[in-house]
Amino acid sequence: MLKELDPYTVFFNEQDVIKFRINNTGEYTGIGAMIGRKDGNIILREIFKDYAADKAGLKAGDIITQVEDIVLKDYKEDVSNLLKGGKDKKIDIKFLRQGKDQTAQISLNEVDIKAVPYFQLIGKDVGYIVLQTFSTKTTQETKAAILDLKAQGATKLILDLRSNPGGLLTEAVNICNLFVPKNEVIVTTKSKIERHNSTYKTRFDPLDLEIPLTILINERSASASEIVAGGLQDLDRAVVIGNKSFGKGLVQRPVDLPYGTQVKITISRYYTPSGRCIQALDYTKKDASGKAQKTESRQEFLTKAGRKVFDGGGIEPDIAIDEAKMSALAKALNANDAIFNFSTKLYYDNQKAESYQVTDKDFLSFKDFIKSTDYKIETAAEKQLLKFMEVAKEENIDEYVNKDYETLLANIKNNTQAQLEKNKNEIKKLINEELIKRYKYKDGFFAYQVENQIEIKKCIEVLNNPALIKKTLSK
């Protein structure tokens, strides 16, 4: 039945409902780690500093094999539920680290996931704020960060929404309200059912109407992040910098079902103040395999000051940073965990160091690592070629093109080492960013970003150029 709806419609069992509430509040009792599943393995992706997993000596890259008496190899349920419970509850686990069996006892404690995990004064007057989710605490934490930074001397702000997947709509509106007057329309929702049509306006007096503001977005900024970026862009209140956002502009509502379960269904779409639709996928247009296609239209709209902006799925930045886009090869290396696993190996090779900077020698080792391990690197070109062959088979012409297909596929695969070399700097950067979290946790990662990322440097450059801000935000 769910397949007849859009891909974002999902059934929540009782545990999923609890997890959804945790995402909205940012609070739970657990081990304090990000957990992922890959090829049947339960992997610790990131350890949160000073929480239970960290205190028990667990590290990113550890593979959990058993929780109490439950062996996880064939465990199909959500493993995170086994790692939650009452405060101070003790859990015995077994795990693999670099191929060796180990054990640990974890004493659960309360985990507080910050909506604003990091903020910093850059130089003498630029405030930098990372906003990673839109939970019930987002506006409160953002406001506190702004006031703290202003007390330190900040007269300009960077709001970093990169890779923020969204969250509560009301919090997105309230974040905008920090910078725009009361009664401004931030977002409207439109549905085929009239009662689901809504207009969301700012309701409070603003915190600061004048402070120069830049907003950072990327292709993983979605939903509530896009409402903030699109709303402040349409109101000419902030310069949006980075790369085009994800394009998730669907309003979803949880509907209660029996036995504590829910189904989250799509009821309407988001529209920015200028009238732009954020949604990228058009479910009325599907390809041969039944997948929804990205909208191709680029309709023109006007901001409050009369600037031209466009819809077509996602928010386009005022200032694009093409060099910040991840290459197809880098995406493939992230997807197959090559970057993550090599970083784990490199960390243990240099575990006694307080920090580590990836060298050219390490990059050569990475190339050898790719050669010696069975990593499937499926680039965009290879995916398109595979799609072509699927169509050829459907049309019964595959036998006529198979030889050329095999030649092209072999050429793409044989070109991997050359592509690695071409993307050397990007790959080294990704390994560095993964490594820094092993040594310095998330705080160290954010500090590293401030010092090294071109996106943040571009924001500072724009903020230090009032004439450029005026020109960008004017008709």
Language model: regions and residue ranges:
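Short linear motifs in exposed loops
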Residues: 46, 75, 105, 266, ...
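Polar, glycine-rich mid-to-C-terminal structural blocks
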Residues: 224, 236, 243, 247-307, ...
